[in-house]
Amino acid sequence: TGTMPHQHGVEINSLPLPQNMPTIGSILRNAGYETYYIGKWHVPRCFPQGTDEIPGFFNDPIQNNPLGEFTDKEIVDKVISYLKKPKSKPFFLTVSLQNPHDICHWIMKDKTQFLEKYSPKELDSLPPLPANFAINEEPEFLKIIRQPKDYGQETKYTLKWKEIDWQKYLYAYYRLTEKLDSDIGKI
């Protein structure tokens, strides 16, 4: 939309975008473009306005399988197939891959299942922590963030982490980012 959440009213993932809200998709469509959106879309009960789905794909794959490990491959394959087809007019395509968002699942699911492949095999391969990692006294805003709430519970899983846990987290995050980079390269 080009507007801030407080302007369009979608301040959390569970709120829909107003139906009359212009989007880049609707503006470009009105200018004669074919407009498509594929991938992660965290706004309920509405399809990205001003866009078409790539046929056979947009059925809220994230809700059915929230892990990018599975959905990103399907998204990339569909996008590549779409891009190979001849176009009769200019197009605008938004591709919203899930990763590196899987890092949240890595935290919450105790690094189980397939996410193990993003865990280091040897400790000497762990990245160093940033110079500003150590905090002498936790700032007030961090104390507020760590309080129980309906959304964003990831912090409760990290409260007792040691430095090595954070290094493993960074390692996994870097691998997921590399996977994203690889997927973009395929497109």
What spans do the regions from the language model cover?
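Active-site-proximal cap/lid insertion segments
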Residues: 85-87, 97-187
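Catalytic-site neighborhoods of secreted/periplasmic enzymes
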Residues: 1-93, 97-119
